[in-house]
Amino acid sequence: FLPAVLRVAAKVVPTVFCLISKKC
C-alpha cells in the first residue's frame, strides 16, 4: 500500500471503531 493509504486508514479505522462502540 501507499503511505497515503496507510495514513487514511489510520484515521478511518479509529473513527469507525468509535462509531460502532459509541464511545466517542
Swiss-Prot record:
Q: What is its main location?
A: secreted
- Taken from the UniProt record, the cysteine pairs bridged by disulfide bonds within this chain are C18-C24
> Where is the protein localized?
Secreted
Q: GO cellular component annotations, sorted alphabetically?
A: extracellular region
Reported tissue expression: Expressed by the skin glands.
What highest taxon heads this organism's lineage? Eukaryota
- Family according to the record: Belongs to the frog skin active peptide (FSAP) family. Brevinin subfamily.
> What is the recorded name of this protein?
Brevinin-1JDc
Tell me the organism.
Answer: Odorrana jingdongensis (Jingdong frog)
